[in-house]
């Protein structure tokens, strides 16, 4: 019985793209899978036929041979592309192989692990993380910082190829560049990573002496990083392409800089706002006055203290906080008063305070209010 055209089997045209071929296969595989067609005696044969067609059309080399020679390209004894490891011809079209292939394409890594990964000649380098501690002043101003980052770079001797003299790798003779081989174990066909090329699909005949064929080498690089004004602890800065070098010419990873702003000895930060706790004397709080306070940019501001101020009272200096990270405004600075009780009093100071207390019974509303509340509480307990 003559074989059907592989394109007709998958329901696609001869000019179909790889994605269209894959979609056609997935559709047919779902329709024809034996588990869903227990009442159709032809389902298994049609299922294997679809898998056989996809096995040819998904591979550019096999597809080119099929487009040129048709089914004859894969018949035994022909000059068709029959690669080592059982990839060339239709003898592998048994149900076990078909079952494996359909689950590879329908469910990816769940059943197939890293199948087909050997065809990827290049791989992206790893991302790197760098923790950077800066002061609050540096976070306020922004800065240009030079950091030393250990990692891997493309080997300068072989230009990342891994081969001596920068020569290009050659196709692995064991798997013909597929990165995987198949072995028959009873009813099942087992697919595994090619032991010769470790799944890369290529081998290096003369490894580079400097990097021993890795194509990369360890190196600590000095990088200049722009820290924008307004960063805070947890801010992440991404430097694209500054991570580890890629494998076999693949793109480099990225470098992520995580900012940690040190605690300040004067200011506490909450978002864009700054808080500064300023001690004032008891007389300044009672009589009023003014106090000079520092600002984060290194300047000074005078703040008026209203008479009768209590501990915890806050006064705002607008626009004296931290800048927003992307220039959207500036926070404020809050001055919190801490009224200081005098210590180590002289006899004269004690006498004056006692005289003051005797004269100030009507000048302490909060104290009077508190003790009236306490007296009312006690009276209520007695009744």
UniProtKB/Swiss-Prot annotation:
Binding positions (Zn(2+) 2): 172, 175, 194, 197
Cofactor(s) required, per the database record: Zn(2+)
Function: Participates actively in the response to hyperosmotic and heat shock by preventing the aggregation of stress-denatured proteins and by disaggregating proteins, also in an autonomous, DnaK-independent fashion. Unfolded proteins bind initially to DnaJ; upon interaction with the DnaJ-bound protein, DnaK hydrolyzes its bound ATP, resulting in the formation of a stable complex. GrpE releases ADP from DnaK; ATP binding to DnaK triggers the release of the substrate protein, thus completing the reaction cycle.
CDD domains reported in the protein's UniProt record: DnaJ, DnaJ_C, DnaJ_zf
Domain J: 5-70
Subunit text: Homodimer.
UniProt KW keywords: Chaperone, Cytoplasm, DNA replication, Metal-binding, Repeat, Stress response, Zinc, Zinc-finger
Matches recorded under PANTHER family: CHAPERONE PROTEIN DNAJ (PTHR43096:SF48), DNAJ HOMOLOG 1, MITOCHONDRIAL-RELATED (PTHR43096)
Domain notes: The J domain is necessary and sufficient to stimulate DnaK ATPase activity. Zinc center 1 plays an important role in the autonomous, DnaK-independent chaperone activity of DnaJ. Zinc center 2 is essential for interaction with DnaK and for DnaJ activity.
GO molecular-function term, one example from the UniProt record: heat shock protein binding
HAMAP family, per the entry: DnaJ
The keyword Transport is assigned to this record: no
Annotated protein name in UniProt: Chaperone protein DnaJ
Organism from which the protein derives: Dinoroseobacter shibae (strain DSM 16493 / NCIMB 14021 / DFL 12)
A Gene Ontology BP annotation from the UniProt entry: protein refolding
Pfam families: DnaJ, DnaJ_C, DnaJ_CXXCXGXG
Cofactor note: Binds 2 Zn(2+) ions per monomer.
Residue positions binding Zn(2+) 1: 155, 158, 208, 211
InterPro entries: DnaJ, DnaJ_C, DnaJ_domain, DnaJ_domain_CS, HSP40/DnaJ_pept-bd, HSP_DnaJ_Cys-rich_dom, HSP_DnaJ_Cys-rich_dom_sf, J_dom_sf
Family membership noted in the UniProt record: Belongs to the DnaJ family.
